[in-house]
């Protein structure tokens, strides 16, 4: 998951 946002921390596996 290449997105340095708050969502990237909860969706780090995707």
From Swiss-Prot:
One of its GO terms (molecular function) is rRNA binding. Disulfide bonds: none annotated. The keyword Ribonucleoprotein applies. Signal peptide: none annotated. GO terms for cellular component: ribonucleoprotein complex; ribosome. Keywords: Ribonucleoprotein, Ribosomal protein, RNA-binding, rRNA-binding. The keyword Ribonucleoprotein applies. Protein S19 forms a complex with S13 that binds strongly to the 16S ribosomal RNA. Belongs to the universal ribosomal protein uS19 family. This is Small ribosomal subunit protein uS19. It comes from Pigeon pea witches'-broom phytoplasma.
